[in-house]
A protein has these predicted regions:
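Short secondary-structure boundary/capping segments
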Residues: 4-6, 14, 29, 75-79, ...
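Conserved N-terminal beta-strand and adjoining loop/helix that marks the start
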Residues: 1-23, 43
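Active-site-adjacent beta-strand/loop module that shapes the phosphate/pyrophosphate-binding cleft
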Residues: 65, 73-97, 106, 129
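NUDIX/MutT-family hydrolases
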Residues: 88, 97-134
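Conserved Nudix-box catalytic region and its N-terminal flanking loop in Nudix hydrolases
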Residues: 21-60, 64
C-alpha cells in the first residue's frame, strides 16, 4: 500500500571556501539554466551518504578534493522531487577547473553574492549561507 508520499532525491552542493571567498560555477546545461551560477554538486545516489556524494561530485565536476564541513540549516526545493542541501567545504587538493556542466568558475566574497546571477532555485540557500556565516 502506498502512503501518498513521493520519493525525494537529495541534491548536495558545496560552498567551497578559500581565502574568504566561495567558489561559484556557471552552468552550461540544461538550456533553461545555462549561464546561471550555482554552488557545484549533484545528486546523492542510492546507498551513498550526502558527504560521499558531495566529495564524488566535486571531484567529477572540478577535479579537486574537498573536506566537508557543516551543513547549512535548511532544505530547498528544486524541480520535481529534488531538494537541495548545502554544505560548507574546504579545498584541500588541486586547482578547480570546470570539467562537467560548467564553463566558468569564480571566487566571490559574501558581500558580492548579490551581483551573482544565481539559479532561481539556489537563492534561498545562498541567503541561508549568508546568515549562517555572518
Amino acid at each position: 500500500m502506498r502512503d501518498g508520499r513521493r520519493r525525494v532525491t537529495v541534491v548536495v552542493a558545496a560552498a567551497i571556501q578559500r581565502d574568504g571567498r566561495f567558489l561559484v560555477a556557471r552552468r552550461t546545461r540544461p538550456a533553461d539554466v545555462a549561464g546561471r551560477w550555482e554552488f557545484p554538486g549533484g545528486k546523492v545516489e542510492p546507498g551513498e551518504t550526502e558527504e560521499r556524494a558531495l566529495v564524488r561530485e566535486i571531484r567529477e565536476e572540478l577535479g579537486v578534493e574537498i573536506t566537508i564541513g557543516e551543513r547549512i540549516p535548511g532544505e530547498w526545493p528544486l524541480t520535481g522531487a529534488l531538494v537541495l542541501h548545502l554544505y560548507v567545504a574546504t579545498l584541500v587538493d588541486g586547482e578547480p577547473t570546470p570539467l562537467e556542466q560548467h564553463d566558468e568558475i569564480r571566487w566571490v566574497r559574501i558581500a558580492e553574492f548579490d551581483s551573482v546571477d544565481w539559479l532561481p532555485s539556489d537563492i534561498d540557500a545562498v541567503r541561508s549561507l549568508r546568515e549562517a556565516t555572518a
